[in-house]
């Protein structure tokens, strides 16, 4: 198959007018559009997709979301994962690393086993698990259930990782809690440690980073604000070039001005767009649940009954659009932050995150308004 005349988003983060050859479900070559490539392609006797006037981008990679279309990662069933992977694929998210919640110990073990045993049925590829809780701070729990919060427990984590067959890619911790630094030392190099749901001050966050934490979960949310005399976690993450930070750009969690300021402070190469979506995403307003707690959804806003924001009701493609349209971030940067950056962060960049020879042919064709025209996974068009 050859995708011709596309405006291709290339691995170097720029656009090129070109043709992309797909063979056996993988990208075979990416060719700049010339008369020579046109003649070579025409003689290949392959299926031709004319993408004139369209933008071709890698399939998006969401490394932090909980559910969509009525299903949640913590439902712990293959059927829920089928729903999640199908919906995410339909909105251009072709690789997913869904997040767990702070649920009961045995229940979390069951959720991990379900994901580890999951058999791929098409749709988005399940490439990892983001373990958001239970190793967090009670004072910054957000929409997590307080009764299930616990101290970092390396043996329990290993039990969960075994049940998941090694699928846990990120684990969230509050570094100020007892045992957190020792836990980072124990798991360093085997999983990405993310600072999350934390009341840590600057020095404590710096210590965690020095011991191996390299990621910040939904920056600004469930952590102390940036203050000019107390920079906290945000300042510590900013000061460490090896740290990457998630942003929920759904129009609810972070003001567009702060999105712009964050890109200016950190640089796009360190930003990761996430959706943090919950099961109401893709459905109508109403009453739902997240981590066993009741959630009310009105438009893009999802809240607990006390008003606490409870994830989002927006998918990653819409978050990327918001980043461009409302926050004014260049399209090239927004795409990178929703594709290459998250893929690199969880160690799947050899398979996903860019349109490059040898990688899975997961890609999206968009029009100039960033509306989806078609989605391809493993070189096959899926129903949107």
Task: Pin down the residues of each PLM region.
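Conserved, mostly hydrophobic/aromatic
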Residues: 53, 131, 187, 216, ...
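His/Asp/Glu-enriched, well-ordered alpha-helical/loop segment
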Residues: 236-245, 251, 263-275, 280-366
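Active-site core of metal-dependent hydrolases
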Residues: 162-283
């Amino acid at each position: 198959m050859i995708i011709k005349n596309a405006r291709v988003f290339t691995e170097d983060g720029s656009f090129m007018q070109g043709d992309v050859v797909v063979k056996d479900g993988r990208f075979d070559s990416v060719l700049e559009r010339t008369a020579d490539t046109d003649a070579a392609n025409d003689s290949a006797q392959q299926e031709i997709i004319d993408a004139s006037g369209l933008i071709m981008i890698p399939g998006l990679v969401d490394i932090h979301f909980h559910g969509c279309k009525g299903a949640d990662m913590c439902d712990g069933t293959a059927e829920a994962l089928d729903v999640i992977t199908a919906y995410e694929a339909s909105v251009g998210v072709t690789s997913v690393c869904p997040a767990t919640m702070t649920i009961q110990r045995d229940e979390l073990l069951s959720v991990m086993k379900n994901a580890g045993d999951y058999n791929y049925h098409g749709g988005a590829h399940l490439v990892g698990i983001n373990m958001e809780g239970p190793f967090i701070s009670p004072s910054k729990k957000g929409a997590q259930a307080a009764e299930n919060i616990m101290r970092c427990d390396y043996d329990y984590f290993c039990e969960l990782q075994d049940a998941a067959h090694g699928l846990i890619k990120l684990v969230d911790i509050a570094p100020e809690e007892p045992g957190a630094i020792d836990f980072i030392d124990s798991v360093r190099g085997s999983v990405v440690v993310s600072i999350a749901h934390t009341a840590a001050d600057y020095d404590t966050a710096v210590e965690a980073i020095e011991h191996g934490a390299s990621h910040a979960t939904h920056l600004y949310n469930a952590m102390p604000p940036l203050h000019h005399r107390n920079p906290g976690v945000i300042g510590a993450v900013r000061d460490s070039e090896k740290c990457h930070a998630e942003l929920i750009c759904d129009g609810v969690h972070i003001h567009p001005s702060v999105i712009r300021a964050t890109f200016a402070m950190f640089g796009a190469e360190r930003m990761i767009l996430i959706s943090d979506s919950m099961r109401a995403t893709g459905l109508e307003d109403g009453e739902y649940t997240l981590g066993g707690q009741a959630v009310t959804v009105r438009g893009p806003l999802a809240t607990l009954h006390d008003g606490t924001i409870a994830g989002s009701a927006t998918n990653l493609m819409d978050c990327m659009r918001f980043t461009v349209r409302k926050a004014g971030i260049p399209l090239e940067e927004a795409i990178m932050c929703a594709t290459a950056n998250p893929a690199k962060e969880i160690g799947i960049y050899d398979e996903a995150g860019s349109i490059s020879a040898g990688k899975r042919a997961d890609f999206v064709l968009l029009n100039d308004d960033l509306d989806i025209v078609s989605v391809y996974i493993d070189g096959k068009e899926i129903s949107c």
